[in-house]
Amino acid sequence: MPSQMEHAMETLMFTFHKYAGDKNYLSKEDLRALMEKEFPGFLENQRDPMALDKIMKDLDQCRDGKVGFQSFFSLVAGLTIACNDYFVVHMKQKGRK
């Protein structure tokens, strides 16, 4: 029986390929659709209307308009780290460990 972490890994892979389709990469439009559906709170809370363009520029290392799985995973890892940092700060403020 798969562990929670194995399920999380599977979810990341399936989510990427759901939006990438057969081409094995995300276009800017694919990335926008993924972010709007899978991370709605992130885009809703952005004050910068160019946030998605900046994310795409950061992830598109080859400057070919494509985001591969490794870059997608870097985005998810960065968001997870930021969420963890926020969680840790607020848990400490509440006196929890």
Curated annotation (Swiss-Prot):
This is Protein S100-A10. Residues 60-71 are annotated as: Ancestral calcium site. PROSITE patterns: EF_HAND_2 (PS50222), S100_CABP (PS00303). Heterotetramer containing 2 light chains of S100A10/p11 and 2 heavy chains of ANXA2/p36. Does not appear to bind calcium. Contains 2 ancestral calcium site related to EF-hand domains that have lost their ability to bind calcium. Gene3D superfamilies: EF-hand. Because S100A10 induces the dimerization of ANXA2/p36, it may function as a regulator of protein phosphorylation in that the ANXA2 monomer is the preferred target (in vitro) of tyrosine-specific kinase. GO terms for cellular component: cytoplasm. The keyword Chloroplast does not apply. Disulfide bonds: none annotated. The keyword Protease does not apply. Keywords: Repeat. GO terms for molecular function: calcium ion binding; calcium-dependent protein binding. Residues 47-82 form the EF-hand domain.
